[in-house]
Design a protein with these regions (language model features):
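Conserved beta3 VAIK motif of the Hanks protein kinase fold
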Residues: 90
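Structured beta-strand/turn binding interfaces of compact recognition modules in eukaryotic regulators
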Residues: 93
């Protein structure tokens, strides 16, 4: 879905009539947005309006909704905003989920968005609609920090850019080889896509004595295995890798 640039005021006003809102979503290419996401965005708007009743601040404009990155890996971004010096990403959750799940998503988003430009600071947030708790991702400590909407509002630049910079990453590969790029692997300059995360989860949670991992060439099998090994090693487990090679005589 390629969203148009959304102004939160017009987004709210268009909801007064079902037909108008249906047309608004169509012309802005946000037909896939669901009711829980709409509710969360409405709450964010109301919080911003409390801080700026005139709604004239630039923080009300410049949003891309439901943007999908479909390069080598696949990710979806609920709210994105680009300005000359900053990228804002706000993820929307209807109910509270584990902090670990939130962190995994924001780490992936941080890596992708940080690849756009070294001149643009990246700020990542998650808003839980049910509890109205807002978290900011601390990239230094890789932790979630509960913050106020005033802090978020102040973090958003007045200016914005009407271009989705994710489109510039289409031909960029974010799957690395732990064999040939060990420095990137050990400095965590990679992430697993959704399918790889699911495969990793099955491996870690399996109660079987032997588990096999199958996949076509280039799907990241080695990366998954090395990632599992690194995680287990960091938790105090001892890991042994045995590499089987076929010798021709």
């Amino acid at each position: 879905m390629k969203s148009g640039v959304i102004n939160l005021v017009s987004f709210m006003e268009s909801q007064t009539d079902d037909d108008i809102f249906r047309y608004y979503k169509k012309i802005n290419h946000i037909e896939e947005i669901n009711d829980t996401e709409i509710e969360a965005i409405n709450k964010i708007f109301e919080k911003f309006k409390e801080l700026e009743p005139s709604c004239m601040n630039g923080a009300f404009s410049g949003y891309f909704l439901g943007t999908k990155y479909t390069g080598v890996v696949s990710e979806e971004f609920d709210m994105l905003r680009f300005s000359n010096q900053k990228i804002i990403n706000i993820e929307l959750k209807s109910t509270q989920i584990s902090e670990d799940r939130i962190l995994r998503q924001l780490k992936r988003h941080s890596y992708l968005l940080s690849s756009i430009s070294s001149d643009m600071e990246v700020s990542l947030y998650t808003f839980v609609s049910e509890t109205e708790i807002l978290y900011k991702f601390d990239e230094v400590t890789e932790t979630l920090i509960p913050i106020s909407f005033e802090q978020l509002f102040e973090d958003i630049s007045f200016d914005f850019i009407e271009y989705n910079y994710l489109e510039s990453l289409v031909n960029t590969s974010f799957i690395i080889s732990p064999y040939s790029e060990p420095d990137r692997f050990f400095s965590n300059q990679y992430f697993l896509n959704n399918e790889q995360e699911q495969a990793k989860k099955k491996l870690v949670e399996s109660s079987k004595k032997y588990v096999g991992l199958k996949g076509a060439a280039g799907t990241g099998k080695s990366l998954i295995l090395f990632d599992v090994a690194k995680e287990l090693s960091n938790s105090g487990e001892k890991i042994l890798f045995v590499f089987a090679l076929q010798f021709m005589i």
